[in-house]
Curated annotation (Swiss-Prot):
GO terms for molecular function: GTP binding; GTPase activity; metal ion binding; rRNA binding. Monomer. Associates with 30S ribosomal subunit, binds 16S rRNA. The gene is rsgA. GTP binds at T112, K113, H114, D115, G164, Q165, S166, G167, V168, G169, K170, S171, T172. This is Small ribosomal subunit biogenesis GTPase RsgA. One of its GO terms (biological process) is ribosomal small subunit biogenesis. Belongs to the TRAFAC class YlqF/YawG GTPase family. RsgA subfamily. Its main location: cytoplasm. Its cofactor is Zn(2+). It comes from Staphylococcus epidermidis (strain ATCC 35984 / DSM 28319 / BCRC 17069 / CCUG 31568 / BM 3577 / RP62A).
């Protein structure tokens, strides 16, 4: 029996990496009976057959798991946002941060296309990013002439997953970091202000200290796993301020003596962050119940 990490899934075949050696495996029928499927990122025990093939017997407990797309045991989630084309959006960034925290993932913010944005656009984005740095988020800016290896060297060891809407430059980033990958890229749609999906499945690529993965571009972010009462925990600044509210179950919407709203009025919590919290809270409150 060998132990390795699933690095790719295509047509029901799980490719497992064991210290640089790859095996094509399939899960035993027991998994199907239990209605449980391994995912990319899983640590598995498998039995070798025919030298480079085998059957998965056991999946180790997951530290965390992203549902869409399915990938597990992530050490850092890099949220890729472009400065322009598509334009930088704090609302979208906050939604990705909520997703990250809801799945117990450590997020990092990476701003691409630094070189094609105007000086005025970059200064405006940098002023905004300072607010995220104050909250505690690690942030980086890159452009075409950046040192991609130095950028990645700042990241955690283990599995790094790139996430972000289509067209922000995730595949371009990976191609610049590892030119041998030759991943397909597309220009963004001018009418939709977003890119066409070019990554169709999750695959882990080797890097110094671990792996790196692109994810299929998101056309919509799914918050169905989050209850409205949980949302405040996924806005880090709001969560910390909320500990001083008069009522323990304060949702910072209409409740009296709310410390969060006091800090928003004082400018200590950015108004746009609170607005995004309210918008998402209302969306979750108004969603239809699924049966």
């Amino acid at each position: 029996m060998k132990t390795g990490r699933i690095v790719k899934l295509i047509s029901g075949v799980y490719q497992v990496d064991v210290e640089g050696e790859r095996f094509d495996t399939k899960p035993r029928g027991l998994f199907r009976k239990k209605k449980f499927s391994p995912v990319v990122g899983d640590i598995v025990d498998f039995e070798v057959q025919n030298t480079k093939e085998g059957y998965i017997h056991h999946v180790h407990d997951r530290n965390n798991e992203l549902k869409r797309p399915p990938v597990s045991n992530i050490d850092e989630l890099v949220i890729v946002m472009s400065a322009v084309e598509p334009e930088f959006s704090t609302q979208l960034l906050d939604r990705y941060l909520v997703i990250a925290h809801s799945y117990h993932l450590k997020p990092r913010i990476l701003i691409t296309k630094h070189d094609i944005a105007s000086e005025q656009e970059i200064l405006k984005i940098k002023d905004t990013i300072k607010l995220y740095q104050k909250i505690g988020y690690a942030t980086q800016f890159i452009g075409k002439d950046s040192n991609y290896t130095a950028t990645v060297d700042e990241w955690s060891d283990g599995l790094i997953v790139l996430s972000g809407q289509s067209g922000v430059g995730k595949s371009t980033f990976l191609n610049s970091y590892q030119p041998q990958l030759k991943l397909e890229t597309n220009d963004i749609s001018k009418s939709l202000n977003r890119g066409k999906h070019t990554t169709r499945h999750v695959e882990l690529y080797d890097r110094k200290g671990g792996y790196i993965a692109d994810t299929p571009g998101f056309s919509a972010l799914d918050f169905n796993h989050i209850e409205k009462e949980q949302l405040k925990d996924f806005f880090i600044d709001i969560h910390e301020a909320g500990e001083q509210c008069k009522f323990r179950n304060c949702n910072h919407i209409k409740e009296p003596q709310c410390h969060v709203k006091t800090l928003v009025e004082k400018g200590e919590i950015p108004q746009f962050r609170y607005d995004h919290y309210q918008q998402l809270y209302n969306e979750i409150s108004n969603r239809k119940v699924r049966y």
